[in-house]
């Protein structure tokens, strides 16, 4: 049964009438451009064919009812006329409440809604299950009530909800790609202007995501430390963000910086340049150059930004040994575990899967999870 069929059937059972529409918003994987988003830089993600799906209908009162199919059909209910506060027990409900609360601040011309939510974006893998939920909820209200909001505004609203209501610091990339993704394309995003450029993906190339299943423990504290180090670097150059510093300016005075901060800054500056070049390489179908840029990105995350772990490095090496210069592979996401992403000619996918199955667990004691994805369309009706 598809997610659409599942949520529609649950909706009718739970609420006693049929849903009027079903909305989806995808998860994402970032092909290159890591930790550049909060430095006002560039990222190159694509939406993937794993999504959050919501069957919904407007109500003629001010009540919101939400059922979470993936959490034992837990039900949350709140009013649009009372202050929206955090749910005491259901963490999932806070993403919904946060989006609705922040949408009220932007455009309060919507009424109540019934929703049933289900999704298949793997959680805790760094594939943005939370952003896809935020964008899906925003899109539901936008579509049901014809709100004059575009994808970028729905994305910004989701980011605000996550930062201010849920209390998790995140950049804008995850929500933007979920809202604006384009089938068979990646999206080059300028995280300062929020300008986007669709970049066509070469034909016959699979987007493979492999979860190391190494449990991330440091990710919150270390993420904040990296952010502070980048801000320290920007202050040193008297710029609002590292986006405004050139590699030449950095090289001239790198020796004056704290050595750790210097390494962090160098990663951001070189990663921004790589990301812009990667968009051109992809568009020209130059998988060899894309592979080189992904390899440089991984080395920079490992040596300068220091956010990889041995298990991730092992996975990258196993994949690289199979694909050579026919594709690319690197860690993706915040770091300290999580996933790697690879662009692989479709005919090499079975060989990569076999090599990983034979070697990764033997070397690390952990079993990986393997996903073959397609670059997919952003949020909308399904």
From Swiss-Prot:
Keywords: ATP-binding, Carbohydrate metabolism, Cytoplasm, Galactose metabolism, Kinase, Magnesium, Metal-binding, Nucleotide-binding, Transferase. InterPro entries: Galactokinase, Galactokinase_bac, Galactokinase_CS, GalKase_N, GHMP_kinase_C_dom, GHMP_kinase_C_sf, GHMP_kinase_N_dom, GHMP_knse_ATP-bd_CS. Its main location: cytoplasm. One of its GO terms (molecular function) is ATP binding. GO terms for cellular component: cytosol. It is found in: Cytoplasm. It catalyses: alpha-D-galactose + ATP = alpha-D-galactose 1-phosphate + ADP + H(+). This is Galactokinase. GO terms for biological process: galactose metabolic process. Pfam families: GalKase_gal_bdg, GHMP_kinases_C, GHMP_kinases_N. Belongs to the GHMP kinase family. GalK subfamily. Substrate binds at residues 34-37, 223. PANTHER family: GALACTOKINASE-RELATED, MEVALONATE KINASE/GALACTOKINASE. Gene3D superfamilies: 3.30.230.10, GHMP kinase, C-terminal domain (3.30.70.890). Mg(2+) binds at residues 130, 162. Pathway: Carbohydrate metabolism; galactose metabolism. Catalyzes the transfer of the gamma-phosphate of ATP to D-galactose to form alpha-D-galactose-1-phosphate (Gal-1-P). It is an enzyme of class 2 (transferase). ATP binds at residues 124-130. Its EC number is 2.7.1.6. PROSITE patterns: GALACTOKINASE, GHMP_KINASES_ATP. The keyword ATP-binding applies. The active site is at 174 (proton acceptor). The record marks 28 as: Transition state stabilizer.
């Amino acid at each position: 049964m598809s997610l659409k069929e599942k949520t529609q059937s649950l909706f009718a059972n739970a609420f006693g009438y049929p849903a009027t529409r079903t909305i989806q918003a995808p998860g994402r994987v970032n092909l290159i451009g890591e930790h550049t988003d909060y430095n006002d830089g560039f990222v190159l993600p694509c939406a993937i064919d794993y999504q959050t799906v919501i069957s919904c209908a407007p109500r003629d009162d001010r009540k919101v009812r939400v059922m979470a199919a993936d959490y034992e059909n837990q039900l949350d209910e709140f009013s649009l006329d009372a202050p929206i506060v955090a749910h005491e027990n259901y963490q999932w409900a806070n993403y919904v409440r946060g989006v609705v609360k922040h949408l009220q601040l932007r455009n309060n011309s919507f009424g109540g809604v019934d929703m049933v939510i289900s999704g298949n974006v793997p959680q805790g893998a760094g594939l943005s299950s939370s952003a896809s939920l935020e964008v899906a909820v925003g899109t539901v209200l936008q579509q049901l009530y014809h709100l004059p909001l575009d994808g970028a505004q729905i994305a910004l609203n989701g980011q605000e909800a996550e930062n201010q209501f849920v209390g998790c610091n995140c950049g804008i990339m995850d929500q933007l790609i979920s809202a604006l993704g384009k089938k068979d394309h990646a999206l080059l995003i300028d995280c300062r202007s929020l300008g986007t450029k669709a970049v066509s993906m070469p034909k016959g190339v699979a987007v493979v995501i492999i979860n190391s299943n190494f449990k991330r423990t440091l990710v919150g504290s270390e993420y904040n430390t990296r952010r502070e180090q980048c801000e320290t670097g920007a202050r040193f150059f008297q710029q609002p963000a590292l986006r405004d510093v050139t590699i030449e300016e950095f090289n001239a005075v790198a020796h004056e910086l704290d050595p750790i901060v210097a390494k962090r800054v160098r990663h951001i500056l070189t990663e921004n340049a790589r990301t812009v070049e990667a968009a051109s390489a992809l568009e020209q179908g130059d998988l060899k150059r894309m592979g080189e840029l992904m390899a440089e990105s991984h080395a920079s995350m490992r040596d300068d930004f220091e956010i990889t772990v041995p298990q991730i490095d092992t996975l990258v090496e196993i994949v690289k040994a199979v694909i050579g210069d026919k594709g690319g592979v690197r860690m993706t996401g915040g770091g300290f575990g999580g996933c790697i992403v690879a662009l692989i000619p479709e005919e090499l996918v079975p060989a990569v899967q076999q090599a990983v199955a034979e070697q990764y667990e033997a070397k690390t004691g952990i079993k990986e999870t393997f996903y073959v994805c397609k670059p997919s369309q952003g949020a909308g009706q399904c």
